[in-house]
Design a protein with these regions (language model features):
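Short aromatic-glycine-(Arg/Gly/Cys) micro-motifs in beta-strand/loop hairpins
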Residues: 11-24
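Acidic Gly/Asp/Thr-rich repetitive segments characteristic of extracellular carbohydrate-active
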Residues: 22-53
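Active-site-proximal beta-strand/loop segments in catalytic clefts of secreted hydrolases
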Residues: 27, 55-57, 171
Length: 181
């Protein structure tokens, strides 16, 4: 009976230690240094669950989870110290043009895929107060955010997908004007 208990607790301790888990660490101690690189290797329209475990660190990335990616869980080591950040705002010019970004291109994270979960992570747009600056843009369906911090100033979370469902549990969402729209 003791052997059985040891096996069960070893399995519980290695929750993310399986072939369907990718590891990200900014300091280079994992197979990926950037979250975007881990997202890029995920297969389109997966029928199985894929976990991307992100170790503590500051990840300055503008992430898009495209519509063809499904069944992905992005899990941070802890919400306070696992941070995805970017600093675009509505008055930044689109590279190579004389047009400004406007609100909807300023996201730090844009989720177009369905059945995507974020846990224990901070998503922030840390742009100065120079205009709208979206931290999270949700377009996919059945999106789940658990124990996440979503931080910004104006227009922090955009839930603009038509006929989509987004669930926030034990999350802290912070902003100023229209911080959830």
């Amino acid at each position: 009976m003791l052997v059985m208990a040891g096996i069960v607790s070893a399995q519980a301790a290695n929750k993310y230690d399986n072939p369907d888990t990718l590891f990200v660490a900014r300091d280079g101690t994992a197979e990926f240094r950037n979250i975007d690189d881990a997202i890029e290797v995920c297969r389109a329209f997966m029928e199985y669950h894929k976990v991307i475990f992100v170790k503590k660190g500051l990840y300055k990335e503008k992430l898009i989870i495209p519509s063809w990616l499904t069944n992905i869980e992005i899990c941070g080591e802890d919400a306070e110290n696992t941070i995805i950040t970017y600093d675009d705002h509505a008055n930044v010019f689109i590279p190579g043009t004389n047009r400004k970004m406007g609100t909807f291109r300023t996201y730090t994270v844009r989720v177009d895929g369905n059945d995507i979960t974020f846990k224990n992570i901070t998503i922030e747009n840390n742009a100065a107060r120079l205009g709208q600056a979206v931290a999270l843009n949700t377009q996919g369906d059945r999106l789940v955010f658990v124990n996440c911090r979503i931080l910004g100033n104006q227009d922090t979370v955009y839930t603009g997908g038509v006929n989509t469902r987004v669930f926030f549990k034990d999350c802290h969402i912070e902003g100023t004007t229209d911080f959830i729209f």
